[in-house]
């Protein structure tokens, strides 16, 4: 895994990692007990779009479109979030899409 998640990398949850909604909270957890709690609505949407079929850039573009947000800022925030998820061992980075 690289130090920072690249915009052209394809994120997907690692095997055994899932995202669950509990009431108003969304929790990402894995079999080893690592959890990430308190995701805001845009972070939840990023997680939902990380299905192994889209680049990080296309995930950010979709979120920016859905939430009418600045695309550059959403890309920056998305890459930071994905880098954190990768460091926690919650997502895998697939090959770059060319």
Predicted regions located by residue number:
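Long, charge-rich, low-complexity alpha-helical segments
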Residues: 32-98
């Amino acid at each position: 895994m690289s130090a920072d998640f690249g915009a052209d990398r394809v994120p997907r949850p690692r095997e055994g990692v899932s995202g669950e909604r509990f009431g108003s909270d969304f929790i990402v957890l894995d079999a080893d007990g690592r959890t990430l709690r308190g995701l805001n609505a845009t972070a939840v949407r990023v997680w939902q779009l990380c299905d192994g079929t889209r680049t990080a850039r296309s995930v950010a573009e979709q979120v920016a479109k859905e939430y009418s947000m600045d695309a550059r800022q959403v890309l920056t925030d998305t890459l930071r979030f994905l880098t954190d998820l990768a460091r926690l061992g919650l997502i895998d980075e697939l090959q770059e899409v060319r």
